[in-house]
Amino acid sequence: QENGFDNVENKIKLKVKNNNEDYEITKILADFYRIEKKYDLAIKIYSELIKENPNDLWYTYYLRGICYEQSDNWHMAELDFLQSLKIKRNSPNVLNYLAYGWIERDIRIDESFVMLTEAYEENPDSHYILDSLAWAYFKKKDYVKAAELMEEVIDMVPGEAVSLDHLGDIYFAMNRKREAVYFWRQAKDLAKPEDEISDKIQIKLKEYDAS
């Protein structure tokens, strides 16, 4: 697999070199690193693109922000998402990523709720945005609305471990503990071992003698 990565990397690098550092091809290299979770390499190239190219700046800030967030550097991610929104105020994906990050940290809940409502109006078909909006209702302790929306998410993407885990948390807050445990178990079965939520779900299952 590493050999396959090297082959693709070298091919894209050669194209970049042969095309005088062409913006679009260079961006493909950055995107390749991001998809392959080589976030430091992706950040370096996105930073060069931001410095040298005015094209699609809002989107490049957004992609670099994702890399920072995935590298557990929320401070830098937050700055990039905010910068992206300064350039393009109503991008639903950027609104969603930033607002969800705040909600997960229990900060700026009301502001995040407004942003997610706007994002959902812009893109009602995104299960990611609907999940975030449902989670915002949960954080505001409107458990009935949170459950209603998260159930919609599960209808859209039945195998999404994060959403199943969220629904379990919502049901638990509503004192529907048996259903909560059921969805936590489903989430645990579907989550990849390296996923952050796996350990968190295991702790919840152990705590309630349900594993």
Regions found by a protein language model. Give the residues of each.
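Structural marker of alpha-solenoid helical repeat scaffolds
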Residues: 18-19, 52-53, 87, 122, ...
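Terminal, low-structured helical/coil segments at or just beyond the last alpha-helical repeat
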Residues: 166, 173, 177-211
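Register position in tetratricopeptide repeats
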Residues: 1-2, 35-36, 70, 104-105, ...
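Canonical tetratricopeptide repeat
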Residues: 28, 62-63, 97-98, 132, ...
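TPR alpha-solenoid repeat register
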Residues: 25, 59-60, 94, 129, ...
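Residue-level recognition of tetratricopeptide repeat
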Residues: 31, 66, 100-101, 135, ...
